[in-house]
C-alpha cells in the first residue's frame, strides 16, 4: 500500500493576540481546524495529514515583517526540512497532528 502524505504549514505560535495581526492569526487558526477536519475525512484511507508549525524561519517574508531581526539567529529553511522528511516516512504514524519543527 502506498502511503500518501499531506502537510500544511502554519506559524501561529507568536501571532495570536498581537496588535494588528488579527486577520493573519485568524487565518492560521482556520488552517489548524481545516487540517483536523481533513484528517478526519481521510482517516480510513492511506493519506496522512499533519500541520507543521515551522516556528521562526529566515525567509524574505519574515525579514519584511520583522525588519532588524537577525536572520542568522533563527532557523534556516534547511533546519526544519528534517521534520518533513520524518513525517513522510512509512514508519511515521502521526495523523491529524500539529507538529512543531523547532525546539
Model-predicted segments: where are they?
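Short acidic, glycine/proline-rich loop/turn micro-motifs
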Residues: 18-20, 62-66
